[in-house]
């Protein structure tokens, strides 16, 4: 069961090649965007449930660990160079990371240059704020805005209520050695608010229209060079590749914390492959 609709064609092609070489029939089912968990529950209830499925980390594992085959002795687990890429429950290896992704503020180098800046001018939140607000002041003359629309419909809001929210949570975890969410005090909520306000007040769209803006709108604004900055990750490359590799860059998401000049991109294992231990031995072995 495939999590990523944008990779469906590649998975179908791979399944055909595998079947041709091994004689083992592979059926790939791809969940619709934002419907993976619902689809997984439905598929797992069928007589021929998926042998290979995905979870998004410890949260997903909590729901599906009773279905996870221990991959500790598998060939693929032996090839992993770091336990950071494994999803473990005690000594058991329940999942193998397959999507190592980074996210930040993608930017158009050419537009940034037209505005009179380069990446070297943006090392922290204050720098980003200065550049964004200056672009906004001159947007009519420049012909573009600072940020793409920060749409709050289901196709876009995860960029902000999940990815952007990770930043203040991360810094609080680091500062207070927090190990569970119950201990969160909201130390960096003002920083979260500040970066969000910067997005919505310096974008292609009035803040009053954000509820109607979609992820596709943000992509279109960036690709048609209506905005310099676009918060997203490496998975969005195929959507924006027409701009040209030489014209694309990515900045860390700065929120105004001490030492953020040394901050890098947000990087992690976004999804893990799991094998359904309730499948037949033949299917498990083939997988």
Model-inferred region functions:
Residues 70-84, 147, 151-154, 168-194, ...:
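Short, solvent-exposed loop/beta-turn-alpha elements that line the ligand-binding surface or hinge
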Residues 30-39, 125-127, 209-223:
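Short helix-initiation/N-cap motifs at beta->coil->alpha
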Residues 94-98, 103, 129-181, 227:
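Extracytoplasmic/periplasmic solute-binding protein
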Residues 3-60, 78-81:
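Early extracytoplasmic/lumenal segment of secretory-pathway proteins
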Residues 16, 21, 25, 46, ...:
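Extracytoplasmic/periplasmic substrate-recognition and gating elements
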Residues 132-133, 178-212:
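Glycine-centered hinge/linker elements that transmit conformational signals in sensory
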Residues 56-110, 159, 165, 249-251:
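Hinge/lid segment of periplasmic solute-binding proteins
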Residues 24, 44-55, 142, 224-232, ...:
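Alpha-to-beta junction loops
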């Amino acid at each position: 069961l495939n999590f990523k609709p944008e990779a469906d064609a590649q998975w179908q092609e791979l399944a055909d090649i595998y079947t041709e070489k091994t004689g083992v029939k592979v059926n790939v089912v791809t969940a619709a965007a934002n419907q993976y968990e619902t689809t997984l529950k439905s598929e797992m209830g069928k007589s021929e449930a998926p042998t290979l499925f995905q979870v998004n980390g410890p949260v997903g594992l909590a729901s599906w660990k009773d279905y996870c085959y221990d991959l500790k002795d598998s060939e693929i687990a032996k090839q992993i160079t770091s336990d950071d890429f494994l999803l473990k429950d005690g000594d058991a290896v329940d999942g193998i990371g397959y999507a190592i992704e980074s996210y930040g503020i993608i930017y158009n180098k050419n537009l940034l240059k037209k505005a009179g800046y380069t990446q070297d001018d943006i090392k922290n939140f204050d720098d980003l704020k200065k550049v964004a607000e200056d672009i906004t002041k001159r947007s009519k003359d420049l012909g573009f805005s600072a940020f793409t629309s920060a749409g709050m419909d289901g196709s876009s809001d995860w960029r902000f209520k999940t990815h952007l929210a990770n930043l203040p949570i991360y810094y609080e975890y680091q500062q207070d050695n927090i190990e569970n969410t119950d201990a969160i005090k909201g130390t960096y909520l003002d920083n979260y608010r500040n970066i969000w306000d910067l997005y919505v007040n310096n974008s292609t769209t009035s803040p009053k229209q954000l509820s109607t803006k979609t992820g596709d709108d943000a992509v279109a604004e960036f690709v048609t060079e209506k905005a310099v900055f676009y918060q997203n990750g490496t998975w969005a490359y195929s959507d924006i590749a027409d701009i040209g590799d030489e014209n694309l860059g990515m900045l860390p998401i700065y929120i105004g914390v001490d030492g953020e000049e040394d901050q890098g991109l947000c990087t992690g294992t976004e999804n893990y492959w799991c094998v359904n231990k309730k499948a037949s031995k033949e299917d498990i072995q083939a997988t």
